[in-house]
Design a protein with these regions (language model features):
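Lipid interaction determinants
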Residues: 17-140
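Sec-dependent bacterial lipoprotein signal peptides
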Residues: 1-15
């Protein structure tokens, strides 16, 4: 009986050391950070002369630009970022790549995208699109 109790205690002690390696990104981790888009679906941007950015403020306020500027109050839940009431300007850009990205970005944010922050890289992903941003805070 004592051996069983000792084995049970050892098993419980060891199980306490196991953790879930997949940790969801929280709103607090994003807050007060600015990110610049580096790639779309694994392809680097063709023109990086105009930084395409996304910033996170208080209460998960999201703002940034693609072809158009966008902003809205978001929510991060279970590793998903949603900005249900996203405001976006509606201009036509000379750059076809930016025009192609504008609508999908709006849809990603409104419908929800998986968000992952790993060191200096932010990834927004849906079933058909992946956007990778790098940390580019204006102040260290």
């Amino acid at each position: 009986m004592n051996k069983f109790a000792a084995l049970l205690a050892a098993g419980m002690l060891l199980s306490g050391c196991v953790y879930n390696s997949k940790v969801s990104t929280s709103a607090e981790q994003l807050q007060h950070h600015r990110f610049v888009l580096t790639s779309v679906n694994g392809q680097p941007l063709k023109d990086d002369s105009k930084p395409l950015e996304m910033s996170f403020g208080e209460k998960t306020f999201v703002s940034g630009n693609m072809c158009n500027r966008f902003s809205g109050e978001g929510k991060v839940s279970d590793g998903e970022l949603k900005v249900k009431e996203l405001a976006m300007t509606r201009m036509l850009c000379a750059d076809p790549q930016l025009n192609e990205l504008d609508a999908p970005l709006g849809k990603m944010l409104r419908d929800g995208a998986q968000v992952d922050l790993t060191e200096n890289q932010l990834t927004l992903a849906t079933a058909d699109r992946t956007l990778v941003y790098k940390l580019a805070d204006l102040v260290n």
